[in-house]
Amino acid sequence: MKELMVVSKVTTNGVGSGGIIIGAATSAASEASVTPPQDLRERVKDYGQDDVFALWDELSLEERDFLIRDIRSLDLARIDRIIRCSFRSQGVPTPEIEPVPETSVSKVEERTMDERARWWKMGLKAISEGRLAVLLLSGGQGTRLGSSDPKGCFSIGLPSGKSLFQLQAERILRIQRLAAQSNDDTFVPIHWYIMTSPFTDDATCKFFESHGYFGLDADQVTFFQQGTLPCVSKDGRFIMETPNKLARAPDGNGGVYSALKSSKLLEDMAKRGVRYIDCYGVDNALVRVADPTFLGYFIDKGVASAAKVVRKAYPQEKVGVFVRRGRGGPLAVLEYSEMDPSMTLEINQTTGRLRYCWSNVCLHMFTLDFLNQVAHGLEKDSIYHLAEKKIPSVHGHTMGWKLEQFIFDAFTYSPSTALFEVLREEEFAPVKNANGSTYDTPDSARLLVLRLHSRWVVAAGGFLTHSVPLYATGVEVSPLVSYTGENLEAICRGRTFHAPCEITY
């Protein structure tokens, strides 16, 4: 189900493709009476969802009004199609899984300096011509981090105290400057599309406003919301969170495709002259936003989609990996939970690596044409992943299903996908769990940033002093100063920096 989209900076009258919304919510107040509206009762009964009115008699007039509006906001035909298609897909045989062909992966050790320089230059040229947009997936709250704020508002404890949003915004600012310098100082802003959710939208917008968009122009940032879908029981019936309110959940980060479509932002990108979209998740402290090298590689390969990948750290690492579905089939992501344990141990006898070693880290590049294709294709297929969860309900917590699409679902539609290996110590510092957990914490991400930046400073001729062991500290280089360690010699050579500190000039 795709609710009426609310888009900061962009408005839309769309409600998601392919469905009919039942009536107008504005008439609900006049409809709350002794019994539910006849047309609505018949409509929900047609789809086997008449349980939504089970507690009608216990509701006040105001609560009845709310329930009517809640149900009328649903595209019941679309939701019913999603539930039926998703349930039917369970247990259906899937194509045979094969490893990714070696020729589909650009490996770090195989790249020449000339290639890297050429891709960097190609990427900067495309950016300076306004061909690249950045798409941020930021619908999640920091619940596992102990915060109800959007994840991007979170600070991982760097010397600067900067939030994830600020780090990413400043990397965009730096790349804009580098692109302008490479093109006779012709400045073209990179447009930043930020997908929020109903739970994070208001807080995200206010955070950007209160921080002056971190130096970006307000009109180069567009916020839009992903949709939600009703949570359903094991037999496909809607779960009621309260007697007059449906239990809902965001439709997964793959909801970005239908959200872009219904918000008419794909058309907006086309009007801006965008051809390529750099897409990533918010919870990576080392993400190279708008990476010119990756963009240049993508353009050079001439593919519809690409993904940065890292090698699995060990066989049992709980990450999804890229695979080929079926002989000669498309590349796709196989979740760790979908892998047979024996698969995780298989070795490629030629390379000595794991056969299934290329981890998905949510760093993707798409053409705009391909995004349009995916937005229509996923909507037509209506097959969502079923995530079994404890759903808050009128009966306490009920075991049921959340219906989700994932960003990587797009790859099965791609006529051509290329994988680009990166080093996790340079580009992947996930922030998913609270400090005290064994992995992917703010502390572990902070140390990855400080260690990388310390290596940059030493390579540029700087020196470090420290009052605690260096493995537990380091220096932070402002993204406004350097994107990948470039241009630091003039700042660092011969200077001594006491860790921890931030280098800003």
Language-model features: locations:
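Structural beta-sheet core signal
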Residues: 134-136, 194, 223, 279, ...
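Residues at the starts of beta-strands that form the adenosine-phosphate
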Residues: 191-192, 220, 304, 416
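Catalytic core of tubulin tyrosine ligase-like
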Residues: 269, 273-278, 286-290, 295-475
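N-terminal glycine-rich phosphate-binding loop and ensuing alpha1 helix
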Residues: 22, 27-219, 230-233, 239-258, ...
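Conserved beta-loop-beta/alpha segment of the NTase-like Rossmann-fold superfamily
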Residues: 212-214, 218-317
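An acidic- and aromatic-residue-enriched active-site/binding cleft used to recognize and process polar
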Residues: 137-141, 150, 158-159, 197-200, ...
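Intrinsically disordered, low-complexity regions enriched in glycine and serine
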Residues: 14-22
